[in-house]
Amino acid sequence: MKILVYLEKSDVRGGIEIFAERHVARLRAEGHEVEVVDCFSEKRMTAGDFDEVVVHKCSDVATLEKLPPEKTVYYVHDHEPICPRTYAYTPLKRNCSCAGGLWPCLFCAPLCRNWKSALKRVFAQKRRIAAMGRFKKLVVISEFMKSRLVANGLSADKITVEPPVLDGLDAEAERRGDGEGSAPPRLCVEKIDLLFVGQLIRGKGVQLLLAAMSRMKTPRTLDVVGTGNMEPKLKALAVQLGLGGRVRFNGFQTNPRDWMRAARCVVVPSFWQEPYGLVAAEAVALGRPVVAFAIGGLPEACGGKATLVPPGDVAALAKALDDNCEGA
């Protein structure tokens, strides 16, 4: 089968890009002929020449409207298709559960950093939802995201839930019985108590993790794997809270799973509505204790095998970290 895949180029290789790359690799391994194209690329493809069209990321509504509905499968990885601000998080620092539309989105959009782009998305929202509603299938990564699409007027009958494939980690864990890696981790540190893996942006909640560390009964170290615009502020906050010597910022690493295998506890302190939570799912599959806020798709990603605490509750997070590190 000939398949056309739309994947908008990004400067950051995040969860969407990783998911799409793995999906394309699986399709090719199954013998399909796959062509990947950016919806803004000069390289134009005629969808009619393909048996199926798969959309992983395409912010151009005009392109979506031209795709053949009977052939198109649309993967909804995050809030962007239904939230003009893209994060389902208001400028008033509140998670948003509203259905998209002129109201209340017209209130939010002008307060965004990229307000012009946000306003354009507000006025294109109705067209985008209509285009999505015509496609033969919509695929989401969690029941939580399915509920968000239904709240925005899309038919539940068209929506399929497909959690991310973890590259054999589930089978590996099942075979060994505990999910721990057999190869020694290749790390630049000797011991990891607490581990955070992800972008250093506000919604990922590292600032709440640092606050929780300052309340823990037993001092622990934290290794941070990842980069982002919050890094300077987080380093300053660690010093301000007296944690400077116990927090290591390790930057981007190519082997995050090795870090997870070596960690006493993997922490996912996101306070925005994570569509799923790939880091949490991978850590659980590797047999690592996980502590996370119970928000968005994180409870599903953890599969009942993590310690979940109320979103934003720093005291509860500190206690959960103490409990999970006890005896270490």
Label for each model-derived stretch:
Residues 257, 275, 280-285, 299-300:
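Short alpha-helical segment that forms part of, or immediately flanks, the ligand-binding pocket
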Residues 304-314, 321-327:
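Conserved acidic donor-binding segment of nucleotide-sugar-dependent glycosyltransferases
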Residues 18, 192-215, 229-235:
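A conserved mid-protein helix/loop that constitutes part of the nucleotide-sugar donor-binding site
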